[in-house]
């Protein structure tokens, strides 16, 4: 089954949103690939960061829907970085190149971990205004592979793919989830050995998020109630780390809800971003927001500032 690859939505996405390639490092082999849709006048867009197996295409349903509603959306895939600080430095340079001062980040699995680490590393000069963390984690030790992290670069491609596929859902799943898995397997096949090895290294290198550095960032935690690669323990850890986070629970969706439950995921992203309407950190064009919604947002903001003044 290759339903997603031949779907009208995916073909429309591929034919209307150009893929850009950007180099920001001295090393010309480090190329960021990204799709940038929606109004370029928006200076605080939402940026999507994929999981180990993903490419920039895996968020095509979010790119199409959100840009259609007036949001600026960037979906990207990483160059080969072997170290978290190296990744954070490269991502900061990319934001500088795109002339983006602050951004909202949606990260899936590894993408969510990298989003948190980037927010943490840049906390003294903040670049992240908010986070949506989908099926994500805060400590790489949950994978029990920190001891192998330094040997991924030696492994052949087929072994690395086997490691990743081991986390995909097994057993019966509904047709949409089956299509999502097929599409992700196809995306996994498109990654070369160094791309996969470097992502697995970042995913398993001994590291954890320091929450006190990013405590002022608005967070939504999005997870699924059915089978995913994340243990219940890892989910509970995220809730503890971000006690004030909004929670977006999906009954089903597996590892890739942004593909197989895109309508629900898009709605939760909208709800998350709505709190910034009418501010300089809005990810949406002001003309696309109804006057009524802006008024509600202004009232909400003024109430918040009043309650802060009282406290």
Curated annotation (Swiss-Prot):
Q: Major place of localization?
A: cytoplasm
Record-linked InterPro entries: AB_hydrolase_1 (IPR000073), AB_hydrolase_fold (IPR029058), Maspardin (IPR026151)
Ordered alphabetically, the record's keywords are:
Cytoplasm
Q: Name one GO molecular function term.
A: CD4 receptor binding
Answer whether the UniProt record assigns the keyword Cytoplasm to this protein: yes
Q: Which Pfam families match?
A: Abhydrolase_1 (PF00561)
Q: Which residues form the AB hydrolase-1 domain?
A: 86-159
Q: What is the protein name for this chain?
A: Maspardin
Origin organism is Danio rerio (Zebrafish)
């Amino acid at each position: 089954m290759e339903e997603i690859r031949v779907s009208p939505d995916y073909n429309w996405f591929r034919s209307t949103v150009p893929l850009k390639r950007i180099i920001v490092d001295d090393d010309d082999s480090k190329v960021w690939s990204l799709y940038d849709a929606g109004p370029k006048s928006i200076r605080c867009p939402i940026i999507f960061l994929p999981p180990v197996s993903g490419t920039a295409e895996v968020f095509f349903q979010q790119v199409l829907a959100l840009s259609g509603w007036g949001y600026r959306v960037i979906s990207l895939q990483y160059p080969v970085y072997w170290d978290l600080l190296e990744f954070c430095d490269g991502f900061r340079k990319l934001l500088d190149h795109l002339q983006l001062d602050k951004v909202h980040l949606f990260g899936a699995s590894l993408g969510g971990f990298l989003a948190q680490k980037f927010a943490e590393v840049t906390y003294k000069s903040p670049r992240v205004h908010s986070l949506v963390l989908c099926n994500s984690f805060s400590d790489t030790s949950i994978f029990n592979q920190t001891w192998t992290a330094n040997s991924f670069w030696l492994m052949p491609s087929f072994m690395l793919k086997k490691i990743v596929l081991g986390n995909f859902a097994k057993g019966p799943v509904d047709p949409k989830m089956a299509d999502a898995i097929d599409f992700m397997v196809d995306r996994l096949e498109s990654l070369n050995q160094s791309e996969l090895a470097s992502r697995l290294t970042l995913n398993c290198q001994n590291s954890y998020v320091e929450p006190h550095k990013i405590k002022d960032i608005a967070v939504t935690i999005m997870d699924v109630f059915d089978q995913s690669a994340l243990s219940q323990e890892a989910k509970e850890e995220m809730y503890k780390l971000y006690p004030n986070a909004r929670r977006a629970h999906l009954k089903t969706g597996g590892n890739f809800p942004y593909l197989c439950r895109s309508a629900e995921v898009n709605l939760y992203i909208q709800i998350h971003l709505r709190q910034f309407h009418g501010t300089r950190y809005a990810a949406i064009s002001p003309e696309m927001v109804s006057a009524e919604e802006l008024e509600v947002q202004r009232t909400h903001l003024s109430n918040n500032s009043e309650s802060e003044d009282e406290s």
